[in-house]
């Protein structure tokens, strides 16, 4: 598909081949088509959904798995986390083992070093998004390596908290700001940590998540019935 893709450096959309991830790309289209096929059961959309991942396979052949991580980052919106999520969920909906195997293969080639190098941290671009994708791979395939890496993601997130001006610890993400919200803020990271706590039962993940939620709540503006936009520049 050709799709409008936003380029932050240009502050405009450009028409180009759809990217690989969930947010505005092929993995997201695959999820929609797989859901549609699951509801209708006609067989009309199955091959189309599976075919959405052909560009991913082609890109891996060109740059390798390490190159893919460098190119896309880790996140759950546009990065490797989104590919893991898309492959695992689409494979489960369609009962397509090839996609589940691809999710497992991609997981096995991820390294703790790539997680340690991540500075984005958030759900769309960083470690929290990878964590959510890894948990889905573990849930759908039982792959132990996925949970091992998810724990490492959790440790990375806990280790990068800083004390906020209002008290609770949270994270610097987009443009170095301590944002709120699901995409780039404390809410998304806290959600990922709560999911990890659910999968492991380890209390430190829950405690870090609850402190992140306390940070979010401290910034709520009751008069506006909303949270302030703390971004320093447009996305």
Where are these regions (language model features)?
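Glycan-recognition and catalytic cores of secretory/periplasmic carbohydrate-active enzymes
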Residues: 1-235
